[in-house]
């Protein structure tokens, strides 16, 4: 029996281990280069990165969306008293400030949706693109 036949399992394990280590080293190198480009201020290189953080809206754009006090809008639509903010899952209460998100016209607590929109430019309910 040849040497390779007796140690076939060991050889397969060794090649699999070498492949895994090579994959890890290449992945580490790619991440390191991407982080260096971002730290050096190379915006174009960082922009070409496959993993970009989600972009939200700026504070000025968020504040431009209509806001109102819940007690003023409660009588407009029947059943509005049962509404809740889907971001924090709390019911709307009197004297709380709400914000309306165009174009889908969903309503949320102003503080909740402001935080959401600063990280994401989509509606928390329907994922419609929110454009200021």
UniProtKB/Swiss-Prot annotation:
Principal location: membrane
GO cellular component, one term: membrane
Transmembrane recorded as keyword: yes
Membrane topology, from the record: Single-pass membrane protein
Pathway connected to this protein: Protein modification; protein ubiquitination
Top-level enzyme category: transferase
First and last residues of each zinc finger (RING-type): 85-127
Keywords attached to this entry: Membrane, Metal-binding, Transferase, Transmembrane, Transmembrane helix, Ubl conjugation pathway, Zinc, Zinc-finger
GO annotation terms (biological process): protein ubiquitination
Subcellular location per the Swiss-Prot or TrEMBL entry: Membrane
GO MF annotation terms: transferase activity; zinc ion binding
E.C. number: 2.3.2.27
Chain ranges passing through the membrane: 10-30
Reaction equations catalysed: S-ubiquitinyl-[E2 ubiquitin-conjugating enzyme]-L-cysteine + [acceptor protein]-L-lysine = [E2 ubiquitin-conjugating enzyme]-L-cysteine + N(6)-ubiquitinyl-[acceptor protein]-L-lysine
Pfam families, A to Z: zf-RING_2
Top-level taxon of the source organism: Eukaryota
PANTHER family: RING FINGER DOMAIN-CONTAINING, RING-H2 FINGER PROTEIN ATL39
Domain notes: The RING-type zinc finger domain mediates binding to an E2 ubiquitin-conjugating enzyme.
Family statement drawn from the similarity comment of this UniProt entry: Belongs to the RING-type zinc finger family. ATL subfamily.
The protein's name in its UniProt record: RING-H2 finger protein ATL39
Source organism per UniProt: Arabidopsis thaliana
């Amino acid at each position: 029996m040849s040497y390779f036949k007796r140690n076939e399992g060991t050889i397969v394990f060794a090649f699999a281990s070498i492949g895994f280590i090579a994959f890890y080293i290449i992945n580490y190198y790619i991440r390191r280069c991407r982080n260096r480009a971002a730290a050096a201020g190379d915006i174009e290189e960082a922009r070409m990165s496959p993993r970009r953080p989600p972009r939200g809206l700026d504070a000025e754009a968020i504040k431009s969306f209509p806001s109102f006090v819940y007690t003023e809008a409660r009588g407009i639509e029947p059943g509005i008293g049962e509404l809740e903010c889907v971001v924090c899952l709390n019911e709307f209460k009197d004297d709380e400030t709400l914000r309306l998100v165009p174009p889908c016209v969903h309503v949320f607590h102003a503080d909740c949706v402001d935080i959401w929109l600063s990280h994401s430019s989509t509606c928390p309910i329907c994922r419609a693109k929110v454009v200021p």
